[in-house]
Amino acid sequence: MNFKELGIDQDIVDALESRGITSPFPIQEQAIPLALTGQDIIGQAKTGTGKTLGFGLPTIQRVVGRDDDQWGSLQKPGAPQALILVPTRELAIQVGNDLSVASKLRNARVATLYGGVPYEPQVEQLTKGLEVVVGTPGRLIDLYQHGALTLTQVRTVVLD
């Protein structure tokens, strides 16, 4: 089985292959087809078994990017459409990096938001527009309470 057979778009497959990722792990084979349809899923697997791409690839594929036909029909183009909550800064960075690799050939912009770093560059990322937010609860709550993070367009939420 390969990612294309799971329903992943060719641009994402190409981005993965450019990094040597060609075959899905078992958790990905189980999760991806369900997640692509928008179903709620719960996945559990050991560290290093591919959970991030199991939820991340469908998330990237399901958002509407700047060059997509549906972009103009969005209520607020550039507002986040997917929110991925992670418990630590380190995991936020890892998940953000993995999703950035997968979205390299796609119009899905990914921002990684967490505390312990300057606030303003993260607000600037949100202002410029993006499709996927990966972040820690504390920083996301802060950005939301200050009006920098809009959640009205979020249709995918992941708790990692």
What feature does the model see in each segment?
Residues 2-160:
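SF2 DExD/H RNA helicase N-terminal ATP-binding lobe
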